[in-house]
Amino acid sequence: MEPDIKSISSESMEGVSDFSPSSWEHGGYLDKVEPEIDENGSMIPKYKIYTPGANERKYNNYMYLICYGFVEDVERTPETGKRKKIRTIAAYPLGVGKSASHPQDLLEELCSLKVTVRRTAGSTEKIVFGSSGPLNHLVPWKKVLTSGSIFNAVKVCRNVDQIQLDKHQALRIFFLSITKLNDSGIYMIPRTMLEFRRNNAIAFNLLVYLKIDADLSKMGIQGSLDKDGFKVASFMLHLGNFVRRAGKYYSVDYCRRKIDRMKLQFSLGSIGGLSLHIKINGVISKRLFAQMGFQKNLCFSLMDINPWLNRLTWNNSCEISRVAAVLQPSIPREFMIYDDVFIDNTGRILKG
C-alpha cells in the first residue's frame, strides 16, 4: 500500500492532514534494551543496531555511534569498598565512522577507555567529554575521542545539576547504540534553511506523535491520548515552504496534493538519541527539493528539536503513533523574532 495522506478541507491557509500508518510500517518502532546485572551488581554493557530507511546500500559500513553511561565519582575508598557514587546518566555522541569491526569489539573497546566528564558554561551550560586509552576498532572515531568534545548540557545529560565541580567525574558506559547508514545518504537540513521565512509562502511542517514505554506524567510531560487511549507525546519539525510567485498563496488543497505525490516514508533511528528518518519515494517540486539540499533521505535528530523529550527515549521503547502534515502560513519577515530579549526597568522589551 502506497503512503498517502487523507484529504483535508481548507477554506483558510492552514490545515492538518494525517499520513497513512503504512508510511511508517517498516522502521517505526525502536525497542529498548533490557538491563542485565552481573554477580557484582553492575550493569552488563550491551549494544543494539538500528537500520532506519530502505537499506539501499547494505554493505557500506557507515555507522553512527552514541553511547550511554553513568556519570560517577572517580574516587573510591579501597578500605571501605564503597561503590562509586552514581550522579546521573549521560549520552556521549561519537558521530559517523566507517568500520567493519564487530559491534561487540566496538563496545568492549569503548568500555576500556577512561572517559572524563566535566561541567562548564558558555552561552548555555555545557558538558565536556574527554577520553584516553588505546584505539584499535575505534580508529574511525579517533578525532572526537582524542580531541575531546563539548555539548549543550540539556542535550546529553539527564540531570546536569548533579555533576560535581569539586570532584573528578567519569562516564561508565553501559550501552552502545549503532545506527547503520545504509541509504544513499543521510542529510540534515541546515538550520539557516529551517529558519527560512518568506511572505506569501505556506510552511510545510510535520507533527509526529510518539508512543513511549514510560510514565509521561512522572517526566513532566502532559501528553495526549491517541485513538486507542494510549498517552502519546509529540514534536513538530519544519520541512520547507511552498512558495508561489506574483505575491499569491498556494491553496492548502494544492499543497496537500503536492505532499501526497512525494510518497513520504518514515522510520526511527538513533542519531543523537532518537531520530526521525524521512525518505522521499515520489515526485517533489524543484523549489522544495532545493530547500532540502536536493536530498531524498532526510534525518532530524530529536536532540536538536526537543532535547527534553529525547532524554525520555534513552532507555524506553518508542514507536510512531501518528504523523500529520501541518500547513501554515510562513511567518512573515516583518514579524520580529528575538533570540535574546532584555527588559529594562521601565518594562520595555529591548532587542538583544
From Swiss-Prot:
Q: What is the effect of changing L94A?
A: Complete loss of budding
The molecular function terms in GO held by this entry are: structural constituent of virion
Q: Which Pfam families match?
A: Matrix_Paramyxo_C, Matrix_Paramyxo_N
UniProt key word Thylakoid: no
Quaternary context: Homomultimer. Interacts with host TRIM6; this interaction inhibits the IKBKE-dependent activation of the type I interferon signaling pathway. Interacts with host ANP32B; this interaction promotes M nuclear localization.
- What does this gene product do? Plays a crucial role in virion assembly and budding. Forms a shell at the inner face of the plasma membrane. Transits through the host nucleus before gaining the functional ability to localize and bud from the plasma membrane. Mediates together with fusion protein the incorporation of the glycoprotein to the viral particles. Also participates in the inhibition of the host interferon type I antiviral response by interacting with and thereby inhibiting host TRIM6.
Name of the protein in question: Matrix protein
Q: Name the gene.
A: M
